[in-house]
UniProtKB/Swiss-Prot annotation:
Gene: REQ
Biased composition regions of type Acidic residues, renumbered to the chain: 165-174
UniProt-annotated location(s): Cytoplasm; Nucleus
Protein name (Swiss-Prot/TrEMBL): Zinc finger protein ubi-d4
Function: May be a transcription factor required for the apoptosis response following survival factor withdrawal from myeloid cells. Might also have a role in the development and maturation of lymphoid cells.
Lineage: Eukaryota, Metazoa, Chordata, Craniata, Vertebrata
Keyword terms: Apoptosis, Cytoplasm, Metal-binding, Nucleus, Repeat, Transcription, Transcription regulation, Zinc, Zinc-finger
Native species: Gallus gallus (Chicken)
Assigned protein family: Belongs to the requiem/DPF family.
GO biological process: apoptotic process; nervous system development
Gene3D superfamilies: Zinc/RING finger domain, C3HC4 (zinc finger)
PANTHER family: HL01030P-RELATED, ZINC FINGER PROTEIN UBI-D4
PROSITE patterns named among the record's database cross-references: ZF_PHD_1, ZF_PHD_2
Molecular-function GO term, any one: zinc ion binding
Amino acid sequence: MAAVVQNVVKLLGEQYYRDAMEQCHNYNARLCAERSVRLPFLDSQTGVAQSNCYIWMEKRHRGPGLAAGQLYSYPARRWRKKRRAHPPEDPRLSFPSIKPDTDQTLKKEGLISQDGSSLEALLRTDPLEKRSLPDPRMDDDSLGEFPVTNSRARKRILEPDDFLDDLDDEDYEEDTPKRRGKGKAKGKGVGGARKKLDAAILEDRDKPYACDNSYKQKHSLKPPDRVCGKRYKNRPGLSYHYAHSHLAEEEGDDKDDSQPPTPVSQRSEEQKSKKGPDGLALPNNYCDFCLGDSKINKKTGQPEELVSCSDCGRSGHPSCLQFTPVMMAAVKTYRWQCIECKCCNICGTSENDDQLLFCDDCDRGYHMYCLTPPMSEPPEGSWSCHLCLDLLKEKASIYQNQNNS
């Protein structure tokens, strides 16, 4: 190292090297000053309590170099552990005051010396009026004001500025052992069973979402006509279904309040007439993506047929849905569902939607664990279900993807 320094000094010059060292020192001083504002602190990444130390020296500490190649030398300082005074005892934990007759008895028995010993000092306490509870805000530094009552000479309690590196990792740890895992053992029982029951009730209520026409039952004095029973995997689908299926009925009921009630048979026929063929929801006449209709697609400007969901009635242009020509022909052959209402074609449920795998030829949904054989991860590229493989043969998307690759 000394040879390297000598080579640098010879190459750049001693004055240039000194200036570079001064600039480096000034930069480090500014950096350390900024860091010292936040000291001490607990490093969240390493979990180590960062405190000040003796690494950083001042200019006044410099001395001449002692070895070859040394420009400066600094005095070595011995590491010293900070002395901690015992905190004042809580008066509530002290011994009760002793009556005079008891004091005389103890002196006779020899428990208390006549000249006053440490035992007498421990047994004697002040009245409760003169006691004051210790301030919890006191730290170890403020304990220097308390006198030392033992026979030893009084020692000065050092301040943090005297020893900057006294704070170490152990200072931030508690000395008392912690009892883990025992405090909450008694909480199990009725409370735990009640929490499990509440969680089960919430899960049954919200997952999956069922349409029971609750708005009409809560805010209308008339008895409910029927319960819809439609189920959805999330709230947006249920809200959309309610807005397009039941809200119009409630508005119609508000208008007909002044008219005599219609028979139940006629009312049920009117409700059935609002449903499409095979009990399907009436489709919307506009696209949810571009807000166009079958006469014009606002993205392309061309007329395009709408594809509607059989459960909620949402509609969309095939180009807005990014359908392929094969998929456009396939969705007309079965009860197509939008992404909000999509269910597994095998088990018929919409749970675990993160496990749903969609066919690239017909847009049907399948749980990966419902397939035969089951799949653990979605395949790369296109995927075709067994129905499309039997129908399209080699024209299926899975084979087209393999041919292109």
